[in-house]
Amino acid sequence: MSTSDSIVSSQTKQSSWRKSDTTWTLGLFGTAIGAGVLFFPIRAGFGGLIPILLMLVLAYPIAFYCHRALARLCLSGSNPSGNITETVEEHFGKTGGVVITFLYFFAICPLLWIYGVTITNTFMTFWENQLGFAPLNRGFVALFLLLLMAFVIWFGKDLMVKVMSYLVWPFIASLVLISLSLIPYWNSAVIDQVDLGSLSLTGHDGILITVWLGISIMVFSFNFSPIVSSFVVSKREEYEKDFGRDFTERKCSQIISRASMLMVAVVMFFAFSCLFTLSPANMAEAKAQNIPVLSYLANHFASMTGTKTTFAITLEYAASIIALVAIFKSFFGHYLGTLEGLNGLILKFGYKGDKTKVSLGKLNTISMIFIMGSTWVVAYANPNILDLIEAMGAPIIASLLCLLPMYAIRKAPSLAKYRGRLDNVFVTVIGLLTILNIVYKLF
């Protein structure tokens, strides 16, 4: 074999799929699978079989194209080790950096409020329905749970991060196991309700409106945007020097594609399994009760008449416990991002960016009081979680995940090669439809 053949063979071997690529595929997948997934079956199943089938068709394109667009933006910076904030500042100046800081903070903070409401409702449902105790005061329950989490965060942050990383895979395995375990309880109610003669495309409960609102919950549930910047930096440092930026972009796209396929397979199977076990009417009731689908499933099995099997009893309690663990995991993960973002905003605008004027401990205390205080107020008010996702959480995520990369592709010279593509139109439409939910909710 010649020297040139040896070099080509070596480069091919080095550039093939690596263990680190598998690790990142699973990492992106694990980041997206959180408490938001527990609300997707409710919105997806709310309109019956046909809307959820249409969402199944849209799920992978939404997950893949939107995250690939964000990854391309992160890849466009001149510094291989630069994160998304540095890249946006490079393209749009300091103002762009401030905008991205605000977007990151306001994309994550409402999620904490959502999880505050969710964990309060889930705990109270478990307390009353599974444990059979008398109802507790809502304000007290919310305060107790938030103080408990604040205590864990304040005194055990490092331990918390380790526990979170260990909980990702048991939670995903639990979702798959529950999806499979529900198969014996599947029924034809959702199919029997399909009446092609009375189907409506428009109107409040029409297919188009249901799918439109479903897009928001898909953007929310199929979201690993918080980790995309770190992922791209890691891949650029690993591949770009030896194989170039174009190869790195293709590798990132390949990893995002595989992560998206895994994510869609698990979440959609879970959603279909829940829908075939329950019914669209049950999903509407779960939305009205403002609880995640696992809590509703637990109550559903608790209300079964006749002799319940050991499996049904186990599933009743396991569903609630898994829901609580999932929400705790998601809350802790998003708290760290919110804390970092709020600390940055306070430092930038309160202390003019001078880190010597304030200690990290003081910053953390100020931020924690605001975060936990605002979360308690929202948890006590108990707004509808799906409405909160559709009106706040998803639109802000869409502005970061969909519209910011599309604007950058249009304006930044280093992204000019991606202009004029159909997938750009798709990502833009998804972003605009998600943001327009705010208008729909107002009227």
From Swiss-Prot:
The chain crosses the membrane at residues 22-42, 44-64, 97-117, 140-160, 163-183, 207-227, 261-281, 311-331, 366-386, 389-409, 423-443. The keyword Cell inner membrane applies. Pfam families: Trp_Tyr_perm (PF03222). GO terms for cellular component: plasma membrane. It is a multi-pass membrane protein. Keywords: Amino-acid transport, Cell inner membrane, Cell membrane, Membrane, Symport, Transmembrane, Transmembrane helix, Transport. The keyword Cell membrane applies. Coiled coil: none annotated. It comes from the Bacteria. It is found in: Cell inner membrane. PANTHER family: SERINE TRANSPORTER, THREONINE_SERINE TRANSPORTER TDCC. Belongs to the amino acid/polyamine transporter 2 family. SdaC/TdcC subfamily. NCBIfam families: PRK13629.1, stp. Involved in the import of threonine and serine into the cell, with the concomitant import of a proton (symport system). HAMAP family: Thr_Ser_transp_TdcC. This is Threonine/serine transporter TdcC. The lineage of its organism: Bacteria, Pseudomonadati, Pseudomonadota, Gammaproteobacteria, Enterobacterales.
